[in-house]
Amino acid sequence: MTTHEERLRDTLKTKELIEEIVGNNKDAFEYLKMLCRITRTLDDIYDGDNENLSREEVLEIIEYLFITLPTNNFFAIHQDVLISQHLSMYNAWMAANKRENGDEIDKIYAHVWRDNIFEVFPIVALLIGGIDHMKCISEKIRVLFKKELGE
């Protein structure tokens, strides 16, 4: 379980990285921001580890899923590429949840799989700025979001 301070720190790091990825593309910024918010909130609901989660926050996520995300211009233009990443994120997250209490090897894999959401960042970077931008962002996420086992 992350602390409130850790969540604030992680949110700031993520926002700064998203700004670097998207430049002045407001739709791409909103897309990544929504995706992070959705996955964080759904993980909190699944784990039951955020007692401060409000009904309004849950409704916000429902609105994102049913209205705001599907009508986001960046997503609409690139959904053929992005949907496959959404499927991969979901699949990895489910596998991580299933194996997080398994043997030592399961726990190592779960530790890595749970952060699969960040793999969409280099894809968005590619769509906006090309392969060199993708490679740069790919390296940054591996450094920025690296955690000790068990964190």
Residue ranges of predicted features:
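All-alpha prenyltransferase/terpene-synthase fold signal
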Residues: 1-151
